[in-house]
């Protein structure tokens, strides 16, 4: 509708539906067109005009393109609520798809794809097949996108009617925009499918690189994103691909630049020549710098992506730190991101410039920005040992300014510097103590108390300083109370004189008798028992040498960083979270006929395993939690548990609660004898491509239990709950079963890989219950773990022999190959091939755990005889024991 059509939105008439109905059936074309515009205007502002469906559909029979577009718009909006009437429009769609005007042909097929009604999809197939082979490229490119929409509605239909093959044929089209749309459609379908659909080989690669130079900017983005998923066969091929893509770095469109950077970064992993890598780093710097002269919103997205890039390849922007200096008119969100990148790029060569900038920022008016700047100085000190003294000098200068929040932030970071460089800069403690009276923030108080306790033997009046804090002990936040407790114990152990003895009695009494905080009370009891039984042991525990803290400027886990770099220029790279952490994507598996499912060249002809087939509509199990109960749904539980174990889980979100079958018995993780009558059984499970924590809570106590909350500690796989624990109030003798959706790679722990999952559960009537569960890989194996035979062999050969781990299971008996493969397929371990070795059967399978870690599996057994030998090859052999645990659990279940 054009600008002068705004009059259609300004009507205030009542009872206009009958009038519109009359105008829609007018014999005059102009009157009908005006009536349709009024209907669209009413629909746009939220009025219900669905009663005019038949009358509007009758207006489709027109040669007027504008009117046809308006009617199609109405159809898209109301077809779902009027599916039976929408069928009336099918004949016109079919007729329009054969119209001489290519615009009308494309419009018809585009609209049919947008109408998400199952009854219409069957009728869409024939016109769509014709449009995919249309003479006009505009029609073909529109039809390509329509295939992706149809796949979302009915994946099986798309497979059966050969649309995927037709889409792949369009990659060879002579029109670059058709190629780009075909690539976009195939990429979309691949993201929502468990089976390999869009795999780029050398032939397709050549066609895409050719089309790249000729298609529009958004077409280039689609092609570059597809190319970034291609794994070159050798360094030479990777160099050739990068050479063809490098000119895109000069493009005016920011999306094209970022997609080109993503693609180049992925291929650089395979390039071995240091000269080539150095030249590529030089070429990528100017376009990334140019992004910072765009609008603030684009700058922010660019900065979030650059943050990831400099963690992987800091040399790209090592000499460009000045472009990240904050301007006076930068929005706060841009300034904050620039600070982060400056910390990452800080080096011994440029630290003086950086410190001057940070010092200037620390005198600005925005409190949050000032705090971040002061903290940045501390992080630079921790990162650069040779610059630490200069950083401390700047912090001391800032403390002398006597601005309260600057002083407090400086004390917080100086505490970290003391941890990083013990027994080096303690001479400044006297200066810090001068600001003692101004501290009013919990973190600053806790930091100052830690410093006093840690260096009590060097501070003459340490007992007086701590006593000044103890006056308000009951009113202090938990963070300060905990630190005061520990600092007082340290003081007593270092100076066991009369003053500290009296202080320790007061503190322990307050912390055990006067408090409701279980953490504080438990720690106080531990100290009390240590001091009363063995003071020397207490010294060994409390005054033990602490590990030196390290630089946190590259804080992302390397595997998570690689995943985020593969998603540059998407929301994932802005959130710094993997897609599955904030998007629940439904994976669709196309059911094939029995003949199609056999592995080519397989000796057994055993079908490859696939995920559970689901309909095109979203399955509730993919997106929601489950609760089986009799009572009505409770209100969402607030996050009172908070940061129970130091983890940083996402905000709690209420979870829907459809019912679920009770399922098989779950292992008990908290027996009633330890839980004051509360018994919890739980286990990680997988359903429809989603990991759940399945729980059964039983109230064997004599009182009502309600207000249940849960928290997961940091763990090796980053498992965290998506929502709050939705459990109804449990009467005595009652029980409830729930399935909590989980995400991965969000709550990562450091150190060696462990299968331990530490959980805390709380309710309104009882203390916090801590228990340990086991992370079983069976629940983590993803649906996209199937490998082609050639890929399996290539990956097996590429991994060193040291990555192969073997284990024998003498107690496991294979009764039949087929039942074994069925069992493994149900846990997403996919059959590749089989061979005979004498009287032994050797099976080859593949599986994949989160972050794309593959497992290449070889099982050897004699059917009917005890004994199973399992060999696994993986890039991360340290988690092989967890894999063997999963295999044993699977066969013994």
From Swiss-Prot:
It is found in: Golgi apparatus; Golgi apparatus, trans-Golgi network; Cytoplasmic vesicle, Clathrin-coated vesicle membrane. The keyword Repeat does not apply. Keywords: Cytoplasmic vesicle, Golgi apparatus, Membrane, Protein transport, Transport. One of its GO terms (molecular function) is clathrin binding. It is a peripheral membrane protein. SUPFAM superfamilies: ARM repeat (SSF48371), Clathrin adaptor appendage domain (SSF49348), Subdomain of clathrin and coatomer appendage domain (SSF55711). GO terms for biological process: intracellular protein transport; vesicle-mediated transport. Disulfide bonds: none annotated. Signal peptide: none annotated. Residues 593-621 are annotated as: Disordered. The keyword Transport applies. GO terms for cellular component: clathrin adaptor complex; clathrin-coated vesicle membrane; cytosol; Golgi apparatus; plasma membrane; plasmodesma. Adaptor protein complexes are heterotetramers composed of two large adaptins (beta-type subunit and alpha-type or delta-type or epsilon-type or gamma-type subunit), a medium adaptin (mu-type subunit) and a small adaptin (sigma-type subunit). Belongs to the adaptor complexes large subunit family. Subunit of clathrin-associated adaptor protein complex that plays a role in protein sorting in the late-Golgi/trans-Golgi network (TGN) and/or endosomes. The AP complexes mediate both the recruitment of clathrin to membranes and the recognition of sorting signals within the cytosolic tails of transmembrane cargo molecules. This is Beta-adaptin-like protein C. It comes from Arabidopsis thaliana. The lineage of its organism: Eukaryota, Viridiplantae, Streptophyta, Embryophyta, Tracheophyta. The gene is BETAC-AD.
